Amino acid sequence: MASCERSLLPIDIIEEICCRIPVEYLTQFKLTCKQWFALLKDKRFIYKYLDLFQEQERFIRIDRIVQIIDPVKGARSSSPIPQEFDNVAQISTMVHCDGLLLCRCKNERSRSYKLAVWNPFLSRVKWIEPMDFYSSNDFYGFGYDNVCRDEYKLLRIFDGEIEDESEIAGSYEPKIQIYDFKSDSWRIVDDTRLDWSIDPPCKGVSVKGNMYWIAHWNNRPEIFIQSFDFSTETFKIVCNLPFECNVLDTAALSSLRGDRLSLLHQSGETMKIEVWITNKLSDEVVSWTKYVDVTSPDLPTLHTDQHLTHPSYFIDKNDNIMVWCEQETEEETDDDVCVSVCMISKDGIVKKQIDAGRCDLCSDNRPFVCGYAYVPSLVPVPE
């Protein structure tokens, strides 16, 4: 299509058209005319579009290539791994916020850790220099100050006691650091003491600029949802979990509709799956409502081994649960894992949506992320 200086359509009509087009096709309009190109770079439009498509989640898989999988449409796309990750042996942690992915990467040569923010859709990467060093046992949060949507911040919780097991239990107070993209610097939060810990296998979730994790008290058994508000830079307990979680059980947290949480629980004994959802997180009191309770011989085992990816899932716009599943192959000498995406309906019907191939458990020579849910966006990587 020939390019033009200006479109014959009014800008509000162009915006309305763009808001109905999937993000994968939007960038094609960059070549149409300068007016359309400018719209796709306009901050107001970028966030308006993102909010409209919050329910258009995808799974991202990084093996020898980057795969974006849309389980609702049964579609997938692929692209090369960014050159910035050439010396990365492994991406061990991801946190998603507004289409941006915070990645903790292990350096292939030095075996040390680095931190990057990456927009897979725009193929942009920014490395974040540490205040001191990054640890294998850091926990991270990613959000923004609600005063301004694009003022992004990172949270780092460094627990030296976990890093070095020879330390005397309880002798080290976890260090809290905040990185502000606006000032391009880290700072330590001095007056925060933590008497709780984040559940290590579970992925944290960023919702409307705040961070949420499954956590537990250090000196008693209760499990709860812990949040961090990036505007006030404070921690807050949101609510307790609506069930008891045993050692063999699996629990996974996800965002829902852009303003609430959902929580998946699979019993390690019966394999029954239940999903709970909250009311709006902005409400004064946040509580759980059971969304679905499924008992079926067709249910997959979501977390069969500690070496496999912790479950990732989301609830689509048709109220189906899309779950990333990994199953070890039955061959004794085979180190591969079969990867698929399953759909669980509210009626308990289980259906495999996509066979995503295999992954090698023993491979340690490439970045690898298997099944992380995120929303593609036009949000630029903060400078």
Curated annotation (Swiss-Prot):
Residues 3-50 form the F-box domain. It comes from the Eukaryota. Pfam families: F-box, FBA_1. InterPro entries: F-box-assoc_dom_typ1, F-box-assoc_interact_dom, F-box-like_dom_sf, F-box_dom, Gal_Oxase/kelch_b-propeller, SCF_F-box_component. NCBIfam families: F_box_assoc_1. This is Putative F-box protein At3g22650. The lineage of its organism: Eukaryota, Viridiplantae, Streptophyta, Embryophyta, Tracheophyta.
